[in-house]
Every structure is written in structure tokens, then in C-alpha cells.
Amino acid sequence: MTKPNNQKVGNRGLSAQCDPHGLEYLEEMSMTSMTLKLPRRRLFQAVLAVVISSGALIACGGGSDSAPPAQTAAFYSTWAGSPQNYNEPFAGGAPVAKSFNNQTVRQIMYVSAGGDQVRVRLSNAIGNQPLTINSTRIAESVGGAAINAATDTPVTFDSATSVTLAAGAEVLSDPAPLAVRPNSSLAVSFYVQNPTPVVTVHSLGRQNNYAASGNVVSAQVLPTTETNQFFAWTTGLDVRRTDKPKVIVTFGDSITDGYGSTVDANNRYPNFLSRRLAGDPSIGPVSVVNAGISGNRWKNDVIGPKGEGRFERDVLGQAGITHTLILLGINDIGFSGAFASGQEVSAAEITAAIQSAVDKAKARGVKALVATITPFKGTIFPGYYSDAGEAKRVAVNTFIRNNRSIDGVVDFEAALKNPADPGAIAPQFDLGDHLHPNDAGYAAMANAFNGALLN
């Protein structure tokens, strides 16, 4: 993944009386003169006097007449959609192939941090042929397929409006001069002129996205001909800031991805967490980025690339990352009983995968936070829950709580469990399948996060 391009803003000023070159010259000449003319004791006293006077000269550079230190503008991740294969088969079936042809596709992304510029990351990581996007625009979303037309902004790639990605490639756009508000929605509109297969996507959008005939990327209200809930080709948005926010990348499965949350409401737990932390001045600026994939597992592909294989790209590759919050493992447990032989995963394998991710994060200077796996007793999915699976979950959570190498534990199990039946989700937080939280459950997860972990 392309690293963020840092751009300098502002200039460091020096007081006219504090020329550093003049100071160096004074010290050099003073030392030369004293070395030639003074005995050792007097030389020491004279050197001390020069050091003290030099300190006084340096100190004047910090006075009220000098300019403030320069600030550096850099890009930080504010939205992500971890890539998957649209055509990936699951449970014996595969979706019908999808493509766009002479159509505009408008996708709505709910960002966390704001900034004064934005750039778009496109991906053809899973495609097997070149991908051409003929035109791209970005604007504030005002609901549904509508945009604030006054904010409609072109997105270019090396100054060109059209971009072609080779199979397996990703590309980062030029910075677009759009001011982005925190915890708001942006609309990214693409035009594809020719038949364009949809392969690289983020499948679980929980967001209505739109398509229309022809090139209408700047339409204030898209004349919609179809809707969908996946994110095609777009895997990230970064914003430029002159401060340095904490960037928390949440990593996990459907519970991170927001399965069952209200469509178009942005009630995934990372959304709730972003809004909650934004209201806490003691924490400072924050960006909460979602790298969940519904159905994801540590040890096996389907659905999506396995967690062990995608952690570095989808988490550590995010611009400006400072923290990761890991919640993954329930599907390794549940699918052990639901799938054919060869899918069995032990508690020891799950804890080893967690430890490996923690070690990778810490080696990059990223704080590794790990969440306990949430209850799933009585889930409606055939073969998913078992007493043996529950024993694995308990063992993994014990490992997490007792692991001293983890920078912080977030106890999502405690936040969601039914006190009368600790292996099950509390009824008020249960989506109804006894595995996934509802909107209130996702809010409870965000409220369980201790902001002090970021400080």
C-alpha cells in the first residue's frame, strides 16, 4: 500500500538577533582564540562563559517575536473497505456475476476523521484483467443518491481523469481539495464506459449504493436505475490533517463489519466508537477505521482472505495507524463444526494467530488492543454452536485477559453477555440469531471501550 505523502505547511521563523550561522561562527572563533592564548584553567572558564552566552542567544529564538514551529500536513486513513472476491463461492453456491457498462456508480462512505483534502484508494487486487475507471468525483452526501453539488470535486490520478489498474494493482489518487467533516458521509461517483466486471469489492456494506445509466457523475441526485450494498473497487479514503490523530484500525469479522445493523444508519460498532471518542476532548483527534470482513476467520479463506494473510495489508497498511483493535476467532470456532473435515481449528491455533498479529503490530510501533470473543450460545446457524466450541471460546478469552504482551484488553464479552446465562448474548443486545448484536449491542460495545487505552 502506498505510504502517505507528507507535505510541509508553514515556515519556521528565526529572530533577526538569533542567526544560527552567526552563533556557530562566534563559537568557532572564540574556541580557536582561546585554544591559542589561554592556559587550561582560564580556557575552561572562558568556554563555560561562551556556552552560557550561547544558551542565552538560543533562548531568544523562542521568544514572543519568533514564528511558531512548522507543522507538517500528512494523510491519515478515515474509511476502509477490506477487499474480497465478489465471485467467491460459499456454502456450495456462488453469486451471479456482476458488471457495469456505460454506467455511473455512486457509493456512500461514512468517514471518521475530517481533513482539508481527501484521496481515494482504488483496488483491482482480485481482478484478473485490467480495470478502467473513466471518471471519478467526490462530494458530500446529503442522503440517498443525492450530493451537495457545491462540494462536487474531481478526483484525478497523476493529473488524469481516467485511470487503468492492471490485474492485482492498487492506486492512490491525487489529493482532492475537498474539506471533509468528521463523522460524515461522502459520495464517490465513478463512470465506467465499457463492460467492467465487478470482482474486487467489500461485500457487506450495510449501505445503499447506486447506479445510473451514462456519465452522470456530477448529478445532484443520481437518476438511479439500481441499488446494491457492496463497495466496488474502493478500498480506502485518506484525509489530510496538520495535527496527528490517533488512527485505530478495527479488525475482525461480521461483528466488526456491522452485520445486522440498520442499513444507511452507520451503526456498526466502529461508527459508534468514532462518534463517542470524538466527543472526548481528553483523547484528542481520532480516526476509527473498519477493517472487518463478514464471515472472516484467522486460519481459512472464505469468506474473504483469512485473517492471518490480510492483517498486514488491511490493518498495518492503513495511513497513519497508531492502534489496532482485534476481534476475530468466533468463526474459526463455529465453522469448525459447521463445515466439512479440514476446517477444524483449535483454541491453541486461534491464540497463536492472535499473538502473531499482536507481535506484528508492536514490531511496527502500533499499539495492539485485543477484544474478548462475544457469546454465541443457542445461535440459529446449524452446527455452529457446541459445548466444545464454547470451551474454545472460554480458553481464547482467558488467554486474551492474561496476555501481558497485549497493550490493552477490551471486554466485549462482558459488555454483551446475559448475566443469567453468560454463554449467551443479553436479549436487549441480540439481533435475533443469538450470534450478532443489534444496534443497541453495537453501541454497548463502543461504550465498553476505555478511552484511557489510547493515552
Q: Can you say where each PLM-predicted feature lies in the sequence?
A:
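Beta-propeller domains
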Residues: 255-301, 323-325
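Alpha-helical scaffolding within the catalytic cores
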Residues: 232, 270-277, 303-319, 352-356
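Bacterial N-terminal signal peptides that target proteins for export
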Residues: 33-47
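N-terminal secretory targeting modules
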Residues: 23-30, 36, 60-251, 256-257, ...
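Catalytic His-Asp segment of secreted/periplasmic serine-dependent ester chemistry enzymes
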Residues: 297, 334, 373-455
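Structural recognition of the beta-strand scaffold that forms the well-ordered cores
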Residues: 119, 247-252, 256, 286-292, ...
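Oxyanion-hole/transition-state-stabilizing segment in secreted/luminal serine hydrolases
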Residues: 261, 293-349
